């Protein structure tokens, strides 16, 4: 819309505010998670004709479907003027098929979509936030790693690395780049341990990272809680304590916890 000369306003409110310039020609709403569905329904009630979508609504109504383009990678940074970095995807899709995740259904098998050069905004810090769900699932991951190193970029693997699929080669590749947290204030690598049954394969991957020179203290581990059937508090604490003992930073995600 902005490219067509339209004025665009970003709002996190579903109801009209007193200071808003009305009326709007188009209203769009998007939600990431399904528990926000009620807010999208409120948006539709408040703004007749509003177009809604996102993974919290359904997986059919996408930006790409609306504008009839295969991939949409053109970000309007002007709506976040204080954000100094660059962000985007070098790949889409995922090799895994986790029951709680919409990515395989929405994006399919892994494929390369952009280079680091495509993502980085010249004139801004050489800091790139990658939104890839399975960076090493793409066939061109070596080219992207070389591009990160050759360009002296700092990179945040924001959506995490699949530790269950780490190999000595990919661990060495991660260690060879300046991986950072998403604020670029320190060294951080994100991954996940979703259930107790993954214990052996998780620590196998962590060991490979350690052997490549990545210390456990750099690794933040998202702990999904409440999704595994009949999960007990003892099992949850076992994961938490093992991560602490290994020197990792556990990050419990209790969004699905119900009892």
Regions found by a protein language model. Name each.
Residues 4, 81-122:
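Canonical Radical SAM [4Fe-4S] cluster-binding loop centered on the CxxxCxxC motif
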Residues 36-38, 58-62, 96-100, 107-109, ...:
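Short catalytic/ligand-binding loop motif for oxyanion handling, primarily in non-cytosolic enzymes
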Residues 230-242:
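Catalytic cores of alpha/beta
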């Amino acid at each position: 819309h902005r490219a067509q000369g339209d004025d665009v306003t970003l709002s996190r409110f579903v109801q009209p505010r007193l200071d808003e310039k009305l009326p709007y020609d188009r209203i769009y709403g998007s939600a990431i998670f399904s528990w926000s569905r009620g807010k999208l329904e409120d948006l539709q009630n408040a703004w007749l004709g509003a177009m809604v979508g996102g993974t919290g609504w359904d997986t059919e109504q996408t930006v790409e479907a609306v504008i009839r383009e295969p991939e949409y990678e053109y970000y309007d940074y002007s709506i976040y003027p204080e954000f100094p970095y660059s962000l985007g995807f070098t790949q889409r899709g995922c090799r895994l098929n986790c029951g709680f995740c919409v990515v395989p259904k929405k994006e399919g098998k892994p494929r390369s979509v952009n280079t680091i050069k495509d993502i980085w905004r010249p004139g801004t810090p050489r800091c790139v936030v990658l939104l890839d769900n399975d960076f090493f699932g793409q066939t061109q991951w070596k080219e992207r790693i070389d591009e990160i190193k050759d360009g002296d970029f700092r990179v945040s693997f924001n959506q995490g690395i699949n530790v269950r699929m780490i190999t000595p080669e990919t661990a060495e590749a991660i260690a060879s780049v300046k991986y950072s947290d998403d604020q670029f204030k320190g060294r951080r690598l994100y991954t996940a341990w979703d259930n107790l049954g993954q214990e052996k394969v998780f620590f196998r991957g962590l060991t490979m990272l350690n052997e490549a020179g990545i210390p456990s203290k750099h690794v933040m581990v998202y702990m999904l809680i409440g999704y595994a059937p009949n999960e007990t508090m003892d099992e949850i604490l076992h994961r938490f304590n093992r991560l602490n003992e290994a020197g990792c930073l556990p990050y419990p995600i209790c969004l699905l916890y119900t009892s």
